[in-house]
Regions:
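Juxtamembrane intracellular "pre-TM" segments in multi-pass secondary transporters
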Residues: 11-29, 206-234, 417
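Short amphipathic helix-loop junctions that connect adjacent transmembrane helices
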Residues: 52-64, 250-265
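Residue-level signature of mid-helix packing/kink "hotspots" within the transmembrane helices
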Residues: 75-83, 167-168, 275-279, 283, ...
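Helix-to-loop junctions at the C-terminal end of transmembrane segments
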Residues: 82-93, 281-293, 378
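Structural signature of the two symmetry-related core transmembrane helices
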Residues: 96-110, 296-310
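Cytoplasmic helix-loop-helix junction between adjacent transmembrane helices
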Residues: 124-163
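Symmetry-related core transmembrane helices of the 12-TM Major Facilitator Superfamily/SLC fold
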Residues: 185-201, 386-401
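A late C-terminal transmembrane helix in Major Facilitator Superfamily
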Residues: 352-379
Length: 417
């Protein structure tokens, strides 16, 4: 057992507060709890800014072209810096890089308040994408370091629940504070990022990857180890999964409002309807991923999402979307912990952050394709993007899921670690 795993088993009082939901034994893992709480706090801060960023930029004179460039700058920099951030984390320590990433995000959130030239918003978003690239890969790698293979499904289920809780709380808090002032939103977002930093520094007391020997081991990992059959399967899944994210970022609110007649309040409700069932289901599905072939969960519940996308494309009113989003949140929760645990099990210990970065990069590439390609289809017919998303996602699930199943059969990784 590694030093980080031993540290992860130290029980702390805060775990007792949420143990009935997530399982007391898992929350005795201090590293898992620290990472989950830190990500929840960080993404609460991120979510707070989401509903006000564009409005704030407009209030400072940003045109629609600048606002579009802001979104592109973030996505491009986040994609470009995924692998470099993982490379650094594998050599210099996941905890250290995660702390630096969170501190940088806090400083950049505060910088919004001092911008007077709208063009600088584009530069700021590029810097935010670069800073954010290191957070999730380092967090997921820390969990893999601290949790035994046979419990990683449950661990990533808990992590997913905390992650989505942050995104659920953030926009609600941000929207409420924006009625007072935009500045208060950015200031509180900084506070949440700093709280995340403190959680990581105080609760994760053992760092790996600090010795020269560890850095040499990380450097010695060949590139082919990052593109094994089970990992390629996971990368394909990430690409297909993020296609809808691109649609969501670029088109979904317009689709709901203009074609299905949804009010702004109902649009917000649809996302809440997705998040709450997902948060509840993720810890349960994580434990299931430790007891069942992960390829089975990925194939069955991945393909179960295909008809949902097709039904979205057939709808003419918005209210059914809220109901279907709730179902979708549950089905998605039954897949994601299995995928996360699979990625962790398929990666070498000295290359975990790089593998996580590549996994995120393939997902971001999928979101690029979704945002650009599906926007063109939307101009032809508003139903086409959803039909195409469903078909492409289904193909990615079949191809990626079969690769993972073949890897299990060959013994490249355990079917049930």
């Amino acid at each position: 057992m590694s030093k980080l795993q031993k540290a992860g088993r130290r029980a702390i009082p805060i775990g007792k507060l949420v143990a009935p939901i997530f399982g007391e034994k898992m929350l005795q893992n201090q590293v898992l709890l620290a990472v989950s709480l830190a990500i929840c706090a960080a993404y609460t801060g991120i979510g707070m800014i989401v509903p006000v960023r564009v409005l704030y930029a407009q209030s400072r004179g940003a045109s629609l072209a600048i606002i579009g460039a802001m979104a592109s700058a973030y996505l491009i920099s986040n994609f470009v810096f995924q692998y470099p951030s993982g490379w650094i984390a594998d050599r210099w320590g996941r905890k250290r890089i995660m702390v630096i990433s969170l501190l940088a995000q806090a400083a950049l959130s505060l910088a919004y308040l001092f911008i007077t030239d709208p063009i600088l918003f584009v530069v700021l978003r590029f810097a935010e994408g670069m800073a954010a690239a290191a957070t999730l890969p380092s967090a997921r790698a820390l969990i893999a370091d601290a949790v035994p293979p046979e419990k990683r499904g449950a661990a990533y289920g808990i992590f997913s629940a905390f992650f989505n809780t942050g995104f659920l709380l953030g926009p609600a808090i941000g929207g409420l504070l924006a009625t007072v002032s935009y500045a208060s939103v950015f200031i509180l977002a900084v506070v949440f990022r700093l709280a995340a930093v403190l959680l990581v520094i105080i609760m994760i007391r053992v760092e790996g990857k600090t010795s020269l020997e560890a850095r040499e081991r990380a450097r010695a990992v060949p590139y082919r180890a990052l593109f094994t059959l089970p990992l390629i399967g996971a990368y394909i899944l990430a690409f297909g999964d993020y296609l809808y994210l691109g649609f969501d970022l670029a088109i979904a609110p317009i689709w709901l409002h203009d074609h299905l007649g949804a009010s702004i309040a109902l649009i917000g409700l649809t996302y809440t309807a997705w998040a709450i069932p997902n948060i509840i289901t993720s810890p349960i599905s994580g434990r299931l991923a430790d007891r069942t072939r992960r390829s089975v969960l990925i194939l069955v519940f991945g393909l179960a999402q295909v008809p949902l996308y097709l039904v979205y494309g057939l709808l003419n009113t918005a209210w059914p979307v809220a109901v279907l989003f709730a179902v979708h949140g549950v089905v998605y929760a039954l897949v994601q912990p299995a995928v996360d645990a699979h990625v962790a099990a398929s990666s070498l210990a000295d290359a975990r952050a790089r593998v996580q970065s590549l996994y995120s990069a393939f997902g971001l590439f999928g979101s690029f394709v979704g945002a650009s390609g599906l926007s063109i289809l939307y101009g032809m017919n508003f139903r086409l993007p959803l039909f195409v998303t469903g078909i492409c996602f289904g193909i990615c699930v079949i191809v990626g899921g079969v690769m993972i199943r073949i890897s299990e059969e060959r013994g490249n990784l355990p079917a049930i670690p």
